[in-house]
């Protein structure tokens, strides 16, 4: 089943050219997401839409328009940014996630059809999280996801937090983060989280091409209840509580 683990390509939005929202949008439209799910995850996952809220979250917004590969839209946004072509480095290592280098090369191939030239820089696995993530302008990354929307947003998207790996700072998003956290009406909170997901999808600095399935194997000697959690691996990390020897 598909959980909240997702693979990402965060851009530092306080650095050129990623500080231009049109450059970010061009890169969003330059990616064939389904191809990445098919070839990197072998079909064991689902396409992402550039926000981190997954199918195991309560307030996943399912009505946000899906971003798909569109060379014309990518070129439109490059032109809006004053560019006829775009040349960018993408740092990657399989330390980021299994298949990250291959995923980056797939991205490179699809983006080329939109006039975007991605130079894939294969970084050493040793020291990747110290020397590349949060340091290089654009890189490969992954997140295991979080059990609640507020937890996910507060960890990686709140302004000023250490793990905001895009340095994206949107005033409306930050306002909604605080109001949704305090909102007791579930319908109002759902609407607030939906707007936050839309803002990230359309303007944010993270490309999120795919969410991964949780694939577990178990002996027939083990038994479990009717449902299996998909927030994290191993029955949402509660295998020792909810499984038993048959």
Question: What positions do the PLM features span?
Answer:
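Short, solvent-exposed loop/beta-turn-alpha elements that line the ligand-binding surface or hinge
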Residues: 1, 10-20, 54-73, 130-135, ...
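Structural transition elements
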Residues: 47-80, 96-102
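Periplasmic-binding protein-like
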Residues: 2-3, 14, 18-57, 99-103, ...
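Periplasmic binding protein-like
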Residues: 90, 103, 108-160, 192-193
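Loop/turn elements at helix/coil->beta-strand transitions in domains of secreted/extracellular proteins
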Residues: 20-24, 32-36, 83-89, 114-117, ...
């Amino acid at each position: 089943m598909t959980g909240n683990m997702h693979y990402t390509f965060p851009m530092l939005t306080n650095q050129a050219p990623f500080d231009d929202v049109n450059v970010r949008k061009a890169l969003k439209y330059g990616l064939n997401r389904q191809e990445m799910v098919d070839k990197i995850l072998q079909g064991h996952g689902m396409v992402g839409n550039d926000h981190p809220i997954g199918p195991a979250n309560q307030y996943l917004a399912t009505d946000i328009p899906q971003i798909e590969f569109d060379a014309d839209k990518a070129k439109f946004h490059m032109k809006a940014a004053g560019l006829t072509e775009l040349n960018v480095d993408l740092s990657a290592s399989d330390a980021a996630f299994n298949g990250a280098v291959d995923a980056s090369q797939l991205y490179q191939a699809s983006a080329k059809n939109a006039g975007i030239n991605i130079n894939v820089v294969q970084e050493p696995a040793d020291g990747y999280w110290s020397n590349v993530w949060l340091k290089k302008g654009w890189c490969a990354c992954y997140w295991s996801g979080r059990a609640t929307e507020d937890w996910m947003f507060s960890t990686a998207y709140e302004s000023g937090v250490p793990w905001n790996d895009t340095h994206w700072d949107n005033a409306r998003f930050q306002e909604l983060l605080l109001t949704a956290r305090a909102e007791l009406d579930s319908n109002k909170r759902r609407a607030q989280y939906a707007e936050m997901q839309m803002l990230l999808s359309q303007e944010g600095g993270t490309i999120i091409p795919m969410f991964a399935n949780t694939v577990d194997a178990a002996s027939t000697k083990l038994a479990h209840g009717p449902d299996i959690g998909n927030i994290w691996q191993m029955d949402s990390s509660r295998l020792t509580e909810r499984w038993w020897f048959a």
